[in-house]
Regions:
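The substrate-binding groove and active-site-proximal loops of carbohydrate-active enzymes
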Residues: 1-7
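Metal-dependent active-site segment of extracytoplasmic phospho-/sulfohydrolases and closely related
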Residues: 7-46
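Secreted, luminal/periplasmic, and some membrane-associated catalytic domains
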Residues: 17, 21, 27, 43-44, ...
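Loop/turn elements at helix/coil->beta-strand transitions in domains of secreted/extracellular proteins
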Residues: 24-30, 72-73, 128-132, 149-152, ...
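C-terminal cap/loop subdomain of S1 sulfatases and analogous C-terminal strand-loop tails that border
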Residues: 38-66, 83-87, 91-171, 205
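Intrinsically disordered, low-complexity polar regions and short flexible loop motifs
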Residues: 174
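Active-site-proximal N-terminal segment of extracellular/periplasmic enzymes that hydrolyze or transfer
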Residues: 179-187
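Bilobed periplasmic-binding protein-like "clamshell/Venus-flytrap" ligand-binding domains
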Residues: 198-210
Length: 215
């Protein structure tokens, strides 16, 4: 694992060096992100590297879960000609937005079936549209659904066992998702239940079916 990370670093370094040699680095956009949070399995010593940071005290909240520790990741973008060095944004985005952003970069109209939202305005320091909500699901850990809507984060776990309860967290006050406030926000839960049904479609591949939702 350490060798893969080191090799990636070396290759990206070689690429950026070559871009500088041919005077194209200033005109090149490079994006980095991750598909999930840190893992706690096998070769990764997440405790030693503190790679899970604030989520390190709970292995249920890292890779494989839809808690913040499993899905909240940083994104780094460099584009010297356009992006101010050292700039920072709290814009909430998703990997689905990368395709929409690239289309926007090339001024290509986004197809109607693409749900991603371009974050190019954020990169350029302009006014940015925001998602009404972001939705996730996975059949790991007995099936999970999650939703981010403004300050609210909702998660339903153990769907395959018949669980229908939705946990709700106010991320402005509770980033670690320790305090379930669903019982005191039933109106929000009702709205989320509707979105959980509207946002999903049956997966094309049966390998991604969730017991209790698809069979």
């Amino acid at each position: 694992y350490a060798a893969m990370i080191s090799y990636l670093d070396e290759i990206v370094g070689s690429l950026t060096q070559k871009l500088k040699e041919i005077n194209q680095f200033e005109n090149t956009i490079i994006m980095f992100t991750s598909d999930n949070g840190v893992t706690h399995l096998d070769q990764v010593d997440s405790g030693f590297f503190n790679s899970s940071a604030m989520f390190s005290d709970n292995v249920d909240m890292v890779k494989g879960s839809l808690f913040e520790g499993g899905i909240r990741v940083p994104s780094f973008v460099t584009w010297p000609r356009k992006i101010k060095e050292g700039s920072f944004s709290n814009h909430i985005s998703s990997t689905q937005d990368f395709y929409a952003t690239i289309l926007d970069l090339f001024k290509i109209k986004k197809p109607n079936h693409i749900t991603g939202l371009s974050f190019l305005p954020t990169l350029l320091g302009k006014k940015q549209n925001k998602h009404e909500y972001l939705y996730w699901e996975t059949n790991s850990r007995q099936g999970q659904q999650a939703l981010r809507m403004d300050k609210w984060k909702a998660i339903r776990r153990n769907i395959a066992t018949g669980n229908k309860e939705i946990e709700l967290f106010d991320l402005t006050l509770d980033t670690k998702e320790k305090n379930d406030v669903s019982k005191s926000n039933l109106d929000v839960i009702s709205q989320i239940e509707i979105i959980f049904k509207e946002a999903r479609t049956t997966p094309t591949l049966k390998n991604f079916y969730i017991k209790g939702l698809d069979f």
